[in-house]
UniProtKB/Swiss-Prot annotation:
Gene (name only): PPM1G
SUPFAM superfamilies: PP2C-like
Protein name per UniProt: Protein phosphatase 1G
Molecular-function GO term, any one: metal ion binding
Main localization (coarse): cytoplasm
Source organism (scientific name): Homo sapiens
Expression across tissues: Widely expressed. Most abundant in testis, skeletal muscle, and heart.
Amino acid sequence: MGAYLSQPNTVKCSGDGVGAPRLPLPYGFSAMQGWRVSMEDAHNCIPELDSETAMFSVYDGHGGEEVALYCAKYLPDIIKDQKAYKEGKLQKALEDAFLAIDAKLTTEEVIKELAQIAGRPTEDEDEKEKVADEDDVDNEEAALLHEEATMTIEELLTRYGQNCHKGPPHSKSGGGTGEEPGSQGLNGEAGPEDSTRETPSQENGPTAKAYTGFSSNSERGTEAGQVGEPGIPTGEAGPSCSSASDKLPRVAKSKFFEDSEDESDEAEEEEEDSEECSEEEDGYSSEEAENEEDEDDTEEAEEDDEEEEEEMMVPGMEGKEEPGSDSGTTAVVALIRGKQLIVANAGDSRCVVSEAGKALDMSYDHKPEDEVELARIKNAGGKVTMDGRVNGGLNLSRAIGDHFYKRNKNLPPEEQMISALPDIKVLTLTDDHEFMVIACDGIWNVMSSQEVVDFIQSKISQRDENGELRLLSSIVEELLDQCLAPDTSGDGTGCDNMTCIIICFKPRNTAELQPESGKRKLEEVLSTEGAEENGNSDKKKKAKRD
């Protein structure tokens, strides 16, 4: 089934929070692997990036989950470390942080960490394994030589003499197993079995929590707890949500770079095949001749395809099987400080605000065929194919990672074929702004911005049997199920990983209960009996809210 499972993985990782005391921002998130063979999304929900700022973000990885997870782990701190951030210049800080984390992906230390996240062996591990294999071969040969040295001539003849004439004739073109060297283990061994860890619910715990990680096979979370790995810097205010799904061997991301290198070998093999054919006896059937003509036509078509792929290549850009080089991620990051919403985006994930029920896009989808993006790609020496892919590879034009598209030494990072420089949009929040949605393209490829806003708008005021408003995460879960394709027979719509966060700009429940609470205080002064009744009612409502 290619890149898809036989059945979708619909287990969701979900959670809710109410924000920080100084910045109450109720939020809910959910993530689902879906039809994909692995989960490559990640996200951040950090109500207190600092005492005045909240951060929410989604990362949609491609070529592996490692870059998305790395960004979820380190980007929040990198943003805070920027000089511009400390000076209160949040737009500049986001631009600098995106470029800074992208540059870090090329360092040896980070490449090793990415390899560990991805489950790929590092160069050191490969070398050690190679040396160990050579030692094993040497030991086997030494043991065999020692055994033969102690054998009699009769025993040697018995072992080798009978096999002297049993070997197959040597092939003129060189024998082989039919397997390409290095075709196995491109992504290391299969990952560990899926596992989850749950933390107990805390009824009176802190309201500010940070959710950091990716989601694939974990149980639905609660407001105060999620499954995950502790120790992530951005998740110290609360647990994270993380689990690993079994990995299949990685398909070579830069296949189109390799084909031309094999072209000369294929040509030599074709020449040798033709020589062998000429040496065979004459007189074969017309059916065989037709089959040979069909084969020739197929070979010519393959050669034409190879020539087209070779035309797409850029000199000096060899495909490199290295995390951060053949893998990357989109990133959409929203910072909320006071009444200011600042959104940075690189890629095709999206942030949308509901303004009096109307969808307001706070980000642009970066596609290679867009005029601005296409001009930059061509200027960097690349081209966009008919199916909207950069040099036949990526179908987006901005991303963190993907460094084999960023090797033009004559251009700065922001002007490379694939750029990590984000677009920035700023919005001053008013009473008309109800909520914000941040999601990967697994959602936006199925539903438009307005359709998502309408869907949430129709659910956000619904109450459960106890009269409580629905959890935001339950609305997101319903949205994910709505977007999931029934099968994979279509064009891939609804078959992608899905991650979505809903953030409300106003406290939920609190505004509705405040007038009643004030009235009860007045009754307490006027009537002791009324005070007792209302006091008991207050306790019940408080218990529900907690």
